[in-house]
């Protein structure tokens, strides 16, 4: 018998439940794909083998007296674990999985402790009453308890804590009622919102994707039920479209309003529609700006007035806006909440206090990076905004909630200093900067009577000790229940590999939602929300009903702990159980944010002392302004330099779980890097899922801001050496992905009695869809041997990648050393260097990009007439490109035939070639070199920030083209580099 921490009477009579309803009668390895049984009334989470340091069998079965077992559903179960209905399981604690150490992982990946073992977890669904007694009979002993003894904040602990039982919220699957045609696939559901009505019903709204389009849906869960309606959900947006996020609330007349953002006439605006119990009203358009209006939240006050906040771009800057609705006057005109002069403002949150005053929280990008702000609308007038946290750390995604005393509880997540600044491959870079997803933690504060305060116990202190891959608590959602108890719900990362360091691409992970409440003195242990596994940025929405109970809705993609991949996007809802009794008055103290610390340095890099306030680029704003002001006037046309990144992953990619969310990547591009464009290029294995590809393209449109920021549509087609990885860029939305054929994976051996299948099929696909491709990491195991080339569709190569290294040539600047395997990120294939392609006569321009992890240290520079998708893609086709690791201006031209030729162009001339060179660095230029046919033919050491000169080659051009390009290296600490695209010259 496993002993329990609390004593209780031993069972004298065991009556097995004989009336169980078995929804699934077959043994199954499925976990998160199995739906919760709607005819149960109690959910318990069982964890086996906590603290085990060896593989131990915990198989067993459940027995119930005065109640019934409805179903056992696996949760955290791995290969070999099984559920055998109706009441038996097979499960073991199993060794944690370690990522295999590759040569370049030396000094990065941590060794797993030999006693690192994973505990299986499963849910028990019961029909229970105060007399129900449960026995869990396991191979390690029995656990006996009364079902009502397991409450929130009071879990059952047995066998010295090796087996635990926790009360769980009862999950309700949303949007799957009614009968849809057999020929129709299920919708991919996402972006949930929740409202509780005065009569106790719960309304959920969400977006649903199917057949290349999505809509807004809603449905009502009646009070007292644990299942959605047996009817097809309401289609709030009446036709297929392109929608983003939802918000829902009830007005004074009992009408339920849904708001959403939708792309109409190539712009995102907010729309609203109300349901009076019989029919839906006409759709009302709430915004008419020429730039995106998205990221909205809505709440109702005690009078049934609705309050709406959102992020809207005006004149290329994001601001926070507010409007309201009442049944007499309808929707008001928008008011700007953030200051006119404020920088980009993001992600508003909203709460209403007991006096119907609205408080709006948001984060904005300033000199310190992202900071969080709060502003109240008291008695109809806006008070001055309050800077809640404005340190050198990244502070973002603020949420707010009012308690019964009108204190405003605030929660946000943080990361390190200089977020999104210089972070990348070179082993000598030691900038005081933080990558996009190096860390996340949650901080909580309280705004009370004009003062900023904090709980006496920091939220972080209550979280479990983190392993290498588990130090991520993020996207908090704060709420206050009817007992005046503050809660913080958050996303928590669970990696597939348990030794992955934050400097290494993480291969597969999931995030689950957990919640913790403040009991007046301390934060509770985190409590899991069921069916909450999913991608990084799936948001949790919660409201309080008239009885004080918290009601929540959340999306999930139902990924599991075996595969860690998107499976079936769904939406769930639940009433959240709380501890009984009124919460004590919270113990608070003055808010004292800890001092900022220097950025964490990768463990395998040189370490140096630095101040937390040390800037990365003190003159960055001026450098960016200079590069944007620079004009190429060539043959009667004007070209400008548009800075971007043509190769970026997020957590949608299978190896992108240390890259952060899609939205964080756009934040980085717009704010931290001040880019003009970006192409997020998820692996085809990430976006081959139809919904992920749709969502990826949706974000490209959401974050297009006039001509100031223009994302591009693209993905990465990942085929190993010798065919190689290539990024694909489209000038438009909606092209399909191309699958990878089996024999494209042939690495050169005649394993299947076939020669390797080359990329000809891929080249045909690019022609068909008017796309272009760019090889990258060409000198690695992801690269190419340059056996195949199509100049029409493959005009440019990624010469440098800040996640890894340079691929210009062997022994060139920043190239991987040929005799140092730990510095050969991704392997070493010298036949894939760009110089080899040039030697073959391939006419490839160059650009630099990031891939994974690296930020602010690789720029794809496009010379275009305007910042539009067509113009940018045309610049790539013409090879009007160069690559740089900093904001370096490179102007490299050939003067001949009474005109000038830009980099990337071809010229037939009769005289010796003459080149004009102009370079402006961000620091002193150390070396400026001209390379002809892979040989350096000219060099100078300017020792100043500018170089302006001409170079004439005394050798006349021949029949076969010679190519010339410029490369630059600065003399600053990190020796920043730039490469022009070549100019090809032949005799006339």
Feature roles, as predicted:
Residues 129-133, 303, 547, 912, ...:
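Extracellular Ig-like/FN3 beta-sandwich strand-entry sites
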Residues 104-145:
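Low-complexity, intrinsically disordered segments enriched in Ser/Thr together with acidic residues
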Residues 137-141, 555, 967-971:
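Beta-strand-rich extracellular modules
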Residues 1-12:
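N-terminal Sec-pathway targeting helices
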Residues 36-83:
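Low-complexity, serine/threonine/proline/glycine-rich extracellular segments that form mucin-like
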């Amino acid at each position: 018998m496993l002993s329990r921490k609390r004593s209780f009477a031993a069972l004298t009579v065991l009556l097995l439940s004989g009336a169980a309803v078995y929804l699934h009668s077959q043994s199954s390895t499925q976990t998160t794909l199995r739906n919760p049984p709607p005819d149960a009334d109690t959910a318990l989470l069982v964890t086996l083998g906590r603290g085990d340091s060896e593989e131990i069998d915990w198989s067993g079965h459940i027995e119930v007296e005065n109640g019934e077992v409805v179903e056992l559903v696996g949760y955290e179960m791995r290969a070999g674990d099984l559920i055998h209905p109706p009441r038996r399981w097979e499960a073991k604690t199993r060794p944690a999985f370690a990522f295999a150490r590759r040569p370049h992982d030396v000094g990065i990946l941590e060794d797993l402790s030999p006693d690192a073992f994973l505990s299986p977890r499963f849910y028990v669904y019961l029909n229970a009453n105060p007399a129900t007694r449960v026995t869990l009979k396991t191979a390690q002993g029995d656990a006996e308890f009364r079902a009502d003894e397991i409450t929130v904040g009071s879990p059952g602990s047995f066998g010295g804590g090796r087996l635990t039982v926790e009360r769980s919220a009862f999950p309700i699957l949303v949007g799957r009622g009614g009968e849809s045609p057999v020929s129709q696939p299920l919708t991919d559901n996402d972006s949930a919102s929740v409202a509780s009505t005065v009569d106790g019903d719960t309304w959920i709204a969400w977006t649903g994707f199917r057949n290349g389009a999505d809509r807004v849906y809603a449905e009502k869960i009646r009070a007292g039920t644990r299942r959605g309606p047996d009817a097809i959900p309401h289609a709030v947006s009446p036709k297929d479209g392109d929608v983003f996020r939802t918000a829902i609330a009830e007005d004074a007349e009992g009408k339920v309003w849904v708001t959403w953002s939708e792309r109409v006439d190539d712009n995102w605006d907010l729309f609203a529609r109300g349901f009076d119990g019989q029919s839906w009203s006409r759709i009302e358009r709430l915004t008419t700006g020429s730039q995106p209006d998205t990221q909205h939240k809505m709440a109702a006050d005690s009078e049934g007035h609705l309050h709406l906040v959102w992020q809207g771009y005006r004149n290329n800057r994001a601001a926070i806006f507010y409007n309201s609705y009442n049944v007499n006057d309808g929707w008001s005109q928008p008011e700007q909440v953030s200051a006119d002069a404020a920088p980009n403002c993001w992600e508003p949150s909203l709460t209403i206090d007991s006096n119907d005053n609205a408080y709006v929280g948001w984060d904005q990008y300033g000199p310190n990076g992202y900071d969080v702000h709060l502003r109240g609308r008291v008695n109809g007038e806006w008070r001055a905004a309050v800077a809640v946290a404005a340190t050198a750390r990244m502070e973002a995604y603020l949420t707010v909630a009012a308690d019964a005393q009108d204190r405003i509880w605030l929660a946000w997540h943080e990361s390190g200093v200089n977020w999104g600044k210089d972070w990348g491959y070179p082993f000598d870079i030691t900038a005081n900067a933080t990558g996009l997803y190096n860390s996340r933690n949650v901080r909580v504060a309280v705004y009370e009577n004009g003062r900023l305060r904090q709980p006496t116990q920091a939220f972080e202190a209550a979280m479990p000790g983190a392993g290498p891959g588990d130090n991520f608590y993020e996207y908090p959602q704060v709420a206050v229940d009817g007992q005046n108890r503050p809660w913080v719900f958050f996303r928590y990362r669970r990696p597939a590999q348990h030794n992955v360091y934050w400097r290494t691409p993480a291969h597969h992970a999931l995030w689950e939602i957990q919640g913790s409440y403040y009991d007046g003195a301390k934060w509770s242990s985190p409590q899991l929300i069921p069916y909450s596994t999913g991608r990084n940025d799936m948001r949790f929405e919660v409201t309080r009903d008239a009885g004080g109970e918290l009601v929540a809705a959340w999306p999930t993609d139902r990924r599991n702990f075996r595969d860690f991949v998107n499976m079936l996007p769904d939406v769930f809802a639940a009433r959240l159980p709380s501890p009984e009794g009124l919460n004590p008055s919270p113990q608070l103290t003055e808010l004292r944010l800890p001092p900022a610390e220097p950025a964490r340095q990768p463990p395998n890099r040189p370490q140096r002392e630095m101040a937390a306030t040390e800037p990365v680029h003190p003159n960055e704003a001026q450098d960016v302004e200079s590069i944007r002001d620079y004009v190429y006037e060539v043959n009667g046309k004007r070209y400008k330099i548009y800075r971007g990144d043509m190769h970026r992953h997020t957590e949608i990619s299978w190896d992108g779980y240390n890259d952060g969310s899609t939205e964080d990547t756009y934040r980085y591009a717009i704010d931290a890097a001040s880019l003009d464009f970006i192409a997020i290029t998820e692996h085809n294995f990430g976006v081959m899922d139809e919904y992920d590809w749709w969502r990826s393209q949706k974000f490209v449109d959401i974050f297009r801001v006039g001509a100031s920021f223009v994302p591009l549509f693209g993905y990465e087609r990942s085929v190993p050496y010798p065919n190689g990885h290539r990024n694909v860029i489209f000038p438009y939305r909606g092209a399909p992905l191309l699958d990878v054929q089996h024999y494209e994976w042939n690495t050169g051996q005649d394993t299947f009695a076939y020669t390797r299948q080359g990329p000809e099929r891929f080249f045909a696909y690019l022609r068909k869809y008017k796309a272009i491709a760019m090889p990258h990491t060409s000198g690695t195991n992801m690269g190419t041997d340059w056996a195949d080339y199509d100049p029409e569709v493959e005009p440019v190569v990624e010469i440098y990648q800040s996640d890894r290294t340079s691929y210009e040539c062997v022994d060139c600047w920043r190239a991987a050393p040929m005799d140092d395997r730990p510095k050969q990120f991704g392997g070493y294939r010298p036949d894939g260097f760009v110089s080899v392609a040039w030697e073959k006569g391939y006419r490839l321009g160059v650009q630099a990009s990031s891939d994974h992890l690296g930020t602010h240290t690789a720029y794809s520079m496009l010379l275009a007439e305007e910042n539009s998708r067509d113009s940018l893609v045309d610049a790539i086709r013409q090879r009007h490109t160069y690559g740089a690791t900093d904001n370096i201006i490179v102007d490299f031209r050939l003067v001949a035939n009474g005109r000038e030729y830009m980099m990337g162009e071809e010229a037939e001339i009769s005289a010796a070639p003459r080149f004009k060179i102009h370079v402006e660095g961000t620091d002193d230029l150390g070396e400026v070199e001209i390379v002809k046919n892979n040989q350096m033919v000219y060099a100078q050491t300017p020792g100043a920030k500018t170089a302006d000169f001409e170079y004439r080659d005394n050798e006349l051009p021949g029949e076969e083209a010679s190519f010339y390009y410029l490369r630059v290296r600065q003399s600053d600490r990190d020796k920043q580099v730039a490469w022009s695209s070549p100019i090809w010259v032949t005799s006339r």
